[in-house]
């Protein structure tokens, strides 16, 4: 991929759509510290609290399908939407192993389409932060509202400006494993609210050598008040 500095703000999501290519192969390995089971327990508890014991649930930004599978295991009829063909490929491998009847759709969150409404929509692991334009985030919220049942609920998480500024900041993280190695360089611009993940991967090849690949990801920090404002507008 090209260097991050050459991209215009309106193209951040397009660059993200090109990412997760080689990283999809090892995404679950390097994300094994995420407590998906606890996340699933929280989501399921919240769904049941609002009377959603079963029915169709949509996951936006489903990635490799880890959470989608956990919700399907709990009896929900799952639809997973993601814009990465490679990530969905990993998700479909999980589906083949589990036998769950999950519908996966390769779609842009800003333009996703369904044939009808759903009981609930969920989005985890800061997927909404990848929507870097305010008007695009409003569009996503409007689509969510359009495809939810009248008594449906929308559950999502987003990274806050505090996390980007104080926790991630301008840091570098490196990890080496048998399955591959990565260098994660993080840079947060407080003025624009844009956070850049520059990810360098070293993945083993069959000939014993390593292949180097670089992926650049952009996220946007939104103030909680702005998120509430956009939700109310939707």
Identify the function of each model-found stretch.
Residues 12-61:
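Conserved class I S-adenosyl-L-methionine
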Residues 138-150:
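A short glycine-rich, Lys/Arg-flanked "PGG" loop and its adjoining helix->strand segment in the class I
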Residues 129-131:
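A short His-aromatic
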Residues 58, 66-111:
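Class I SAM-dependent methyltransferase SAM/SAH-binding core
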Residues 113-120:
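A short acidic, Gly/Pro-enriched loop at the edge of an enzyme's catalytic core
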Residues 124-126:
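Residues lining the SAM
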Residues 155-230:
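SAM-dependent methyltransferase
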């Amino acid at each position: 991929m090209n260097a991050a500095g050459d991209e215009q703000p309106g193209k951040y999501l397009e660059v993200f759509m090109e990412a997760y290519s080689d990283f999809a192969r090892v995404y679950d390995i390097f994300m094994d510290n995420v407590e998906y089971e606890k996340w699933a327990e929280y989501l399921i508890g919240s769904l049941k609290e609002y009377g959603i014991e079963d029915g169709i649930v949509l996951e936006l930004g489903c990635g490799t399908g880890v959470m989608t599978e956990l919700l399907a295991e709990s009896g929900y009829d799952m639809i997973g939407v993601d814009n990465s063909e490679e990530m969905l490929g990993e998700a479909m491998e999980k589906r083949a192993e589990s036998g769950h009847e999950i519908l996966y759709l390769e779609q842009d969150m800003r333009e996703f389409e369904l044939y009808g409404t759903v009981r609930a929509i969920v989005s985890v692991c800061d997927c909404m932060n990848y929507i870097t334009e305010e008007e695009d985030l409003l569009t996503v919220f409007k689509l969510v509202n359009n495809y939810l049942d009248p008594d449906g609920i929308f559950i999502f998480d987003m990274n806050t400006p505090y996390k980007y500024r104080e926790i991630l900041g301008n840091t570098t993280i490196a990890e080496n494993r048998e399955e591959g190695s990565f260098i994660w360089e993080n840079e947060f611009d407080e003025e624009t609210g844009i956070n850049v993940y520059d990810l360098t991967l070293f993945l083993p090849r069959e000939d014993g050598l390593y292949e180097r690949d670089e992926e650049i990801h952009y996220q946007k920090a939104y103030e909680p008040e702005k998120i509430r404002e956009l939700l109310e507008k939707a």
